[in-house]
Amino acid sequence: MSGAAGNKSRIALIGFGEVGTLFAKELIASGRHSVSTYDILFESAQGNELKDKARGLKAEPCPSASAASKDALVVISAVTATSARDAAEQAGGYLKPGQFFLDINSVSPETKRADEQAVARSGAAYVEAAVMAPVAPYGIKVLLGGKRAGELAALLNPSGMKMRAVSEQVGQASAIKMCRSVFIKGIEALAVEGFLAARRYGVEDRVIASLDETFPSLNWENQAGYLISRVMQHGRRRAAEMRAKFS
């Protein structure tokens, strides 16, 4: 399928938050795709501002998810973790055979498998995605799972993506990310609690010096700031994702 933009294939983004915006920038910059998008916040008080942001990136804001997905080769679900199931259920009603549904939401493997069943009734191909490291300028590193995961990776990687199919079984990619997240978020939680306590007692510099002696390659002064800043920046979203994964 291709949209109105000549030979460019259309990509639809359902959800235009932090991750959706990253994907839009990458896909549009490649010059290979036109991008349409819908976000539930388009209907809110901040809707005009968000739609202007989309237009500024040369993405087309649409009045509904089904409108954004019309004629799209790939429909990317990038909503909040708590809305992922609803988005998949709705997509099962408007997607068509020949389309891909790429579920990049950070939810449990069980939720991804339920999403697959919801989309299957439409005849579209479901592919799960686990976004591992959206780091500019090196592309968005993504693990894929599903019977047509390899096909979708081959389609989108020329557009600057760093996608890798890890399994034909839906749930494996999400399981990798979920287990990795246990380590990453645990380390960050230890850093926040440890360094804030050290600062409270006025021994932060001595604690950092001691850590540098034990782990000399890690540069704990820089690591402390980095780990704490990640918690401050992403804490609310991560809390919602963790509730969704273990509910």
Predicted regions and their residues:
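NAD(P)+-binding Rossmann beta1-loop-alpha1 motif at the extreme N-terminus of oxidoreductases
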Residues: 1-70, 98
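Short glycine-aspartate micro-motif
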Residues: 11-13, 101, 126, 143
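A generic structural signal for well-ordered alpha-helical segments
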Residues: 27-28, 54-55, 119, 156, ...
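Conserved beta-strand segments of alpha/beta enzyme cores
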Residues: 34, 60, 100, 125, ...
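Rossmann-fold NAD(P) dinucleotide-binding segment
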Residues: 66-126
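Rossmann-fold dinucleotide-binding core
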Residues: 107-185
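Helical "substrate-binding/catalytic lid" subdomain
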Residues: 176-247
